């Protein structure tokens, strides 16, 4: 199968996020983990999502609501805006923009995700939502002002 990876890397799924979602390897960077989590959302892979959350998040507590959302949500694209690994090498950030539809309504997620590495394995811990001014360039990458693009939704 030579299918491109849903994460938008332009690599084949079998050499990009596929090994992570099949359980054969762990992502070695925060960006690789974020991309694999995007794939897990797109493929409705609840076990992978739960396993990739930091244990302190107690992700099992909201597994049922997450699984319920799968039937109404479709993921349409991912754009990585920036990545950063702090000098301690165990904390990383990935800012991204993802398009999705929920109950057939187009929407997007613009997040700065935080990742922690413990025992050589990266975990998602939480995320914040960077503010976007109406006259800023839209984080979707269109080149338009936010108010003329995704800010209209």
Swiss-Prot record:
Signal sequence coordinates: none
Domain of life: Bacteria
Chain segments annotated as coiled-coil in the UniProt record: none
Disulfide bonds: none
Pfam families per the UniProt record, alphabetical: SEC-C (PF02810), YchJ_M-like (PF17775)
Record-linked InterPro entries: NTF2-like_dom_sf (IPR032710), SEC_C_motif (IPR004027), UPF0225 (IPR023006), YchJ-like_M (IPR048469)
HAMAP family assigned to the protein according to its UniProt record, in alphabetical order: UPF0225
Family: Belongs to the UPF0225 family.
Alphabetical list of PANTHER family matching this protein: ADENYLATE CYCLASE-ASSOCIATED CAP C-TERMINAL DOMAIN-CONTAINING PROTEIN (PTHR33747:SF1), UPF0225 PROTEIN SCO1677 (PTHR33747)
Protein name: UPF0225 protein ETA_15740
């Amino acid at each position: 199968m030579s299918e491109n990876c849903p994460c938008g890397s332009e690599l084949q799924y079998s050499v990009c996020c596929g090994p992570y979602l099949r359980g054969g390897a762990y992502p070695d960077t925060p960006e690789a983990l974020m991309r694999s989590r995007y794939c897990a959302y797109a493929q409705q892979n609840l076990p992978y999502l739960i396993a990739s959350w930091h244990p302190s998040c107690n992700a099992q507590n909201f597994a049922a609501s997450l699984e319920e959302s799968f039937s109404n949500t479709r993921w349409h694209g991912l754009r990585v805006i920036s990545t950063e690994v702090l000098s301690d090498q165990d904390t990383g950030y990935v800012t991204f923009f993802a398009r999705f539809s929920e109950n057939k309504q187009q929407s997007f997620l613009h997040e700065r995700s935080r990742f922690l590495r413990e025992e050589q394995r990266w975990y998602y811990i939480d995320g914040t939502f960077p503010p976007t001014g109406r006259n800023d360039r839209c984080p979707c990458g269109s080149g338009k002002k936010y108010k003329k693009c995704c800010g209209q939704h």
